[in-house]
């Protein structure tokens, strides 16, 4: 999914990989000044875009800046590599709607590969991504100084990992969809104790 859907920088952290799909024939938007086309699988009313880079065959390509607008007001911005109209390669995404920032690898409009996501509330994730989700190895440090380091799946701790809470209590071992239970100790990260079946 491209980054320009309002609040998408945050939304994709909880959205599932099932959102990935081949673009439909009308999934493009054109820079009104140059006519250069950019992929747009989730069109929004009143949105527009500008592209500062090359445009072979009428499609955005190479390195440049994609600036998205909502009713002529700047919203999301991507600076980096584009291939076949998609964010592809290395790039930085920021938003005027929320103060989140992502810097890292992209594939077909998704955060995919290695990257750093800084949230407007002070939280920070650094690690692997798969189709917009924290998946693989990574470290999340929350603004309150709690942290999780280890394996992730679909933006939740999953596999081997270590969570340290604000009181320096450590939960090290095997996690499943954000749930931890070992030796009578229970913890939930990115979910709730109730959703884990612990209450």
Tell where the protein language model's regions lie, with residue ranges.
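Intrinsically disordered, low-complexity repeat tracts enriched in Gly/Pro/Ser/Thr and acidic residues
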Residues: 18-199
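Positively charged n-region of N-terminal signal peptides that target proteins for export
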Residues: 1-5
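Bacterial N-terminal signal peptides
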Residues: 6-15
């Amino acid at each position: 999914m491209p980054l320009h859907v309002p609040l998408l920088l945050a939304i994709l952290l909880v959205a599932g990989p099932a959102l990935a799909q081949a673009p439909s024939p009308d999934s493009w938007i054109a820079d009104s000044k140059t006519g250069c086309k950019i992929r747009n699988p989730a069109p929004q009313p009143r949105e527009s875009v500008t592209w500062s880079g090359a445009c072979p065959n009428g499609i955005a390509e190479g390195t440049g800046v994609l600036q998205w607008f909502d009713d002529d007001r700047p919203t999301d911005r991507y600076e980096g590599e584009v291939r076949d109209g998609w964010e592809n390669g290395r790039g930085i995404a920021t938003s005027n709607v929320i103060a989140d920032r992502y810097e890292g690898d992209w594939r077909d409009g998704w955060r995919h590969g290695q990257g750093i996501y800084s949230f407007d509330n002070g939280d920070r994730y650094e690690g692997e991504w798969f189709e917009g989700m924290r998946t693989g190895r990574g470290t999340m440090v929350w603004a309150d100084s709690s942290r999780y380091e280890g394996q992730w799946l679909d933006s939740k701790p999953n596999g081997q990992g270590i969570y340290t809470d604000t009181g320096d209590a450590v939960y090290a071992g095997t996690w499943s969809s954000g749930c931890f239970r070992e030796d009578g100790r229970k913890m939930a990260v990115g979910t709730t104790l109730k959703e884990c079946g612990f209450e």
